[in-house]
Amino acid sequence: MENVEARYVDLDKLRNIGIMAHIDAGKTTTTERILYYTGRKHFLGDVDEGNTTTDWMPQEKERGITIQSAATTCFWKGYRINIIDTPGHVDFTAEVERALRVLDGAIAVFDATAGVEPQSETVWRQADKYNVPRIAFMNKMDKVGADFYMAVETLVTKLKANPIPVQMPIGSEKDFQGVIDLIKMKAIYWVSEDGSVYEEREIPEELREEAEMRREEMLEKVAELDEEILEKYLEGEEISEEEIKRILRKATIENRAVPVLCGAAKANKGIQPLLDAVIDYLPSPLDLPPVKGWRVSDGEIVYRKPDENEPFTALVFKVQVDPYIGKLVYFRVYSGRLEKGSYVYNSTKGQRERISRIVFMHADKREEVDYVRPGDIAAGVGLKVSQTGDTLCDEKEPVILEKIDFPEPVISLAIEPATKADEEKLVKALLALSEEDPTLQVRVDKETGETIISGMGELHLEIVVDRLKREFGVNVRVGQPQVAYRETIKRPAEAEGKYIRQTGGRGQYGHVILRIEPIPEEEGKNFEFIDKTVGGVIPKEFMPAIEAGIKEAMMSGPLAGYPVVRVRAVVLDGSYHEVDSSEMAFKIAASMAFKEAMKKAQPVLLEPIMKLEITTPEEYMGNIISDLNSRRAKIESLETRGHLKIVVAKIPLSETFGYATVLRSLSQGRASYIMQFSHYQEVPEKIAEKIIKVV
């Protein structure tokens, strides 16, 4: 075990990074190799063999996809690098969002034969949302069809990025031997089988001319980033290695450029220069603006600098239930210092908690430490109420960092224990899982008494059911997947609700006149409440009760009992009784008025529409498209990428159940697809009638 004190590097020598990628770009292998060359890993893990470090849940080992973002720490040239592994599958985009929120920078890994693939666009846009600086790694340069410059070009066409290649490959496909560093103008070759020994040599004569041309292209792009350097460049002066790196670093941190490197992680080539680039171009916590929060007492905006003397502030970005030590709460420290055994205040929940132990994680091993400082990513033991997105802080100076927004689930499944004995275990297990994953919702259907789980897609729920069996030993039976329909209105309507009860003694009196109107989808709001009463016809203290009554009525719409969305409720008028009026009476009156107005407002059913991207060999395309047409899909684009076709379509979720099996048989297993939620849309009348009948 190394000396723990040695683990605390100066803040400028700390890098918190994520590795983001499309599902098969080779992200896990890249992470593995990083851990191997930084000396934390004693054998080379290989995803295809199922023994990698970051993919450590059994389901991931079988499926070869990364689901849980495990935080890992390693050292390189005196710098400490914390890596958050982010999942590349669309059903887990919430997990990606959460990881990006706490990162300072990222490596985007691409497959050099494909460049930007559909899922990489989604992850890239999420990284844009949180202004995460990134460098790009074109992986799989040894694969048939690898084309470095084509892949770089897709960063421009698909992502509108400003890529600046700082390397050029030596050969490609089976002849890929190494890289040329365009800043130093040296060739780098990997000498040993495991890639741990590499050496710099002079650039081979036959590549010299191309290397000079590529360096010129790089210098031109670097010069455009800085006026002083541009002048030097135009006057033909020499630009030093330090200057190039300084300008590139600044531009990367400001999200104005993306340095691009290449390699073949599986063939153990290109990883050490990638680690150098993490240090050269990605920010330390000191390079980024202070984190913004809201003071609990008055809602004023406050900023916290990455300084040990500031009050403690941290954000919880992951909760895992560890079979041995119970609940592990992963957090990122933004300011201040926290010792193990001390108390911390959860400002989101308004409760103080004691953190009994603090651990630094190495994918699935852990190392205990006495305290954490700004920039640290650690996991705490003993925090009972803390959940993802919560702020942990100093009780004397409480702040709330912004909440992380998670998308609404679109698919539901009824689930029941296989035996009586599983009943209690199921409740506990679902509680633990929904605590870990905010996009998993669990509720009990009032009418049928069934337990319903809802999530982001079929794969998401399959994995939940799988984990119930595997981790919690609960056997369950599941129903057919159900679409999370919604209801809304097409025109404004008014209605009145009066609730009057006169039974000996005190009565009940509530009277509300409401108008409801549709909220256009582009406003992105599901509900708005406006009080337009004048002259105190309804005292202000009853307004929250009226709003609560409306919200309760919205949980079950008039057509088929689905939740109501995109409705603005305006209280126009009403009356009250000095003695008999109560919150309860107004809540009921508001609910009555809302239900009445809904009936008049031309209610319609909405269904989730998914964005579907299918990659297929050309010969199956005809069958795939005619099948899509039979599923009410709208084809949006057809693209050719190499010998493959990419079909992009919007399709109702209800038409996609079991699609994996259908696509497999249509393409003899050669086509693949990814799917993610796009928007809600009105259900065609004929289909709506059938849905309403069933209910």
Curated annotation (Swiss-Prot):
Pfam (any one): EFG_III
UniProt KW Repeat keyword: no
Matches recorded under InterPro entries: EF-G-like_DII, EFG_II, EFG_III, EFG_III/V, EFG_IV, EFG_V, EFG_V-like, G_TR_CS
UniProt similarity note: Belongs to the TRAFAC class translation factor GTPase superfamily. Classic translation factor GTPase family. EF-G/EF-2 subfamily.
Cellular component aspect of the GO annotation: cytoplasm
HAMAP family registered for this protein in UniProt: EF_G_EF_2_B
GO molecular function, one term: translation elongation factor activity
Localization: Cytoplasm
Function: Catalyzes the GTP-dependent ribosomal translocation step during translation elongation. During this step, the ribosome changes from the pre-translocational (PRE) to the post-translocational (POST) state as the newly formed A-site-bound peptidyl-tRNA and P-site-bound deacylated tRNA move to the P and E sites, respectively. Catalyzes the coordinated movement of the two tRNA molecules, the mRNA and conformational changes in the ribosome.
Keywords: Cytoplasm, Elongation factor, GTP-binding, Nucleotide-binding, Protein biosynthesis
Domain tr-type G, residue spans: 12-286
Main location (coarse class): cytoplasm
SUPFAM superfamilies cross-referenced by the UniProt entry: EF-G C-terminal domain-like, P-loop containing nucleoside triphosphate hydrolases, Ribosomal protein S5 domain 2-like, Translation proteins
Binding residue positions for GTP: 21-28, 85-89, 139-142
Gene source species: Thermotoga petrophila (strain ATCC BAA-488 / DSM 13995 / JCM 10881 / RKU-1)
GO biological process assignments: ribosome disassembly
Protein name: Elongation factor G
